[in-house]
UniProtKB/Swiss-Prot annotation:
Converts holo-ACP to apo-ACP by hydrolytic cleavage of the phosphopantetheine prosthetic group from ACP. This is Acyl carrier protein phosphodiesterase. HAMAP family: AcpH (MF_01950). GO terms for biological process: fatty acid biosynthetic process. One of its GO terms (molecular function) is [acyl-carrier-protein] phosphodiesterase activity. Keywords: Fatty acid biosynthesis, Fatty acid metabolism, Hydrolase, Lipid biosynthesis, Lipid metabolism. InterPro entries: ACP_PD, ACP_phosphodiesterase_gpbac. It catalyses: holo-[ACP] + H2O = apo-[ACP] + (R)-4'-phosphopantetheine + H(+). The gene is acpH. It comes from Photorhabdus laumondii subsp. laumondii (strain DSM 15139 / CIP 105565 / TT01). Belongs to the AcpH family. It is an enzyme of class 3 (hydrolase). Its EC number is 3.1.4.14.
């Protein structure tokens, strides 16, 4: 799961949006560094990641990638799930629009950035102003995201090429998303992520 999915699942679980979005920028035990609700959000994010990485449908999705790109498939999948969520937001969340959700999330996070990791603050400088979460619906933007990550992290250079597997198996990824993401939504609504190991 990437930024949009983590924020959405956090909302369904009544969990801290700040903690859920920031979790990848926090190393080790967050206890004592942040408030209890933010810590709970960080822990929820980590549980979502564990369940995502080990779920049979996600493992099935990884095998759609060619050998050259399978090593980076988990990262590419995180981004492609956000693509399908952004693209299909109105079907999954008919009660309020994606722009309204993003406005709400931003209002919950930006006032607290001053005490968050510097790299997280840098992310927020682009995430909201450049409308990433809305632009995820555009496959061309997904390609740009993967190229940018590959450029910034040479060890992950295969990310750029992994986009061709997205194009080749797009219908398969779409079908897997519709099996997997509603399941994750249900677990979030049932607060099940509080009961899973990190």
């Amino acid at each position: 799961m990437n930024f949009l999915a983590h924020l959405h699942l956090a909302t369904l679980a009544d969990s801290s949006l700040l903690g859920n979005l920031m979790a990848d920028f926090v190393r080790g035990n967050p206890e004592g560094q942040y408030s209890a609700d933010v810590v709970a959000g960080i822990r929820m994010h980590r549980r979502v990641d564990v369940l995502t990485d080990t779920h049979p449908l996600v493992i099935q999705a990884r095998h759609l990638f060619s050998n050259s790109y399978r090593r980076v498939a988990p990262i590419t999948l995180d981004i492609i799930w956000d693509h399908f969520l952004s693209l299909n937001w109105d079907k999954l969340v008919p009660t309020y629009s994606l722009p309204a959700f993003i406005h709400h999330a931003r209002s919950q996070i930006e006032p607290h950035l001053y005490y968050t990791p510097e790299k997280f603050q840098e992310l927020n400088a682009f995430l909201w102003r450049q409308n990433w979460l809305i632009r995820y619906a555009d496959l061309a933007f997904i390609a740009d995201v993967l190229k940018g990550m590959a450029r910034r992290h040479p060890r992950l250079s295969a990310l750029s090429g992994s986009f061709q597997d997205i194009e080749q198996h797009y219908a398969d990824f779409d079908a897997l998303f519709w099996q997997f993401y509603p399941y994750m939504m249900e677990k979030a609504e049932n607060k099940d992520f509080y009961c899973l190991p990190q």
